[in-house]
Structures are given as C-alpha cells and as structure tokens.
C-alpha cells in the first residue's frame, strides 16, 4: 500500500526497563527503508508501525497505547500522542530519577526543554547514548540554558566546548 504508507514510526514500551536508545527514538518517524529499525538490542521490546499518509491522521484521534503504571506495575492506557519523555514527565520525581538518573531527570524536568528536544539530545548520529558531559559541550545556546535552569552548571564549567563541531541529532 505504498499509496498510503510512506513512513514508519518507532514505538517504545512505556515503562522503567526501556533502554535509553528506545526512549529517545519513541514516536520518531522515518521514510520506509530508513532509520534504526527495532529490535535495537538484546531483549528489545520496541516495535515499528506504519505511518499512514497525513490525509488519514483523523484515524489516530483519540487513539491510546499501553503503559505500565509505575505504582501498581499494571498495564493501562495513555494517549497515543505521548512520547516516552512526555509520559515520563507525568511520573513522580523518584520514578523519573530511577529511569534517567538524578542529573538527566533534572534536565528533563527543570531544563525547559520539550520532550522532543530532550529526546533529540540523547543519542549521537550512530544512535548511541550520549553522556551529559558530551551533550553540555554542544555549541547550542538552548542546551547551555537548559543545563543552567536544571542546576547542572558543573557540566558547563568543563573545558572542551568545540564551536560548531557538535550538533544535536535531528530526529523526525
């Protein structure tokens, strides 16, 4: 059905055990035959789904997806429009910190970044997780501002910022 399916969407599991790669790639869309197709790693639970032509977007209105409730451990439904990081922002601070670590959680929750922009900073161009130190060295003012808002100045005080060399990956 190449007339209505031209892209595919990465769909990650919404729970505590999802890998950093899958967290960051959740809800990204790619042209058919391109992008990091799941499974990405051993025991990967992510999947891919067809992304219909924009003319069919009305079919996704009101759609839901499964997520594991952090308190009960039971599966439930959440809005299909939520990405992994949108969903994670709705969880309690201790849960977010257990998933991301204290500093990365602060960047997500206090840095003023959208979930989409936060996701784009998590992986390098080979789709490998990036350290906070490496992210902080990127030559982007909004990144430095986010680190300051999150109280993570110690990452910015380290030498090694290379102007223009480090750019966040563009996820579509």
List where the protein language model places each region.
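Activation/maturation switch segments at domain boundaries
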Residues: 1-172
């Amino acid at each position: 059905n190449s007339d209505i399916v031209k892209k595919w969407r990465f769909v990650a599991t919404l729970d505590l055990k999802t890998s950093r790669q899958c967290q960051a790639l959740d809800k990204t869309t790619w042209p058919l035959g391109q992008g990091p197709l799941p499974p990405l790693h051993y025991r990967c639970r992510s999947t891919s789904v067809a992304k219909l032509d924009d003319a069919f977007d009305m079919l996704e209105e009101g759609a839901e997806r499964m997520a594991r409730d952090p308190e009960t451990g039971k599966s439930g439904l959440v809005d299909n429009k939520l990405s992994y990081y949108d969903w994670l922002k709705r969880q309690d601070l201790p849960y977010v910190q257990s998933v991301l670590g204290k500093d990365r959680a602060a960047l997500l929750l206090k840095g003023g970044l959208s979930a989409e922009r936060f996701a784009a900073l998590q992986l390098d161009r080979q789709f490998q997780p990036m350290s906070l130190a490496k992210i902080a060295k990127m030559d982007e003012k909004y990144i430095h501002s986010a680190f300051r808002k999150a109280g993570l100045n110690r990452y910015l005080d380290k030498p090694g910022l290379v102007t223009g060399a480090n750019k966040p990956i563009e996820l579509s």
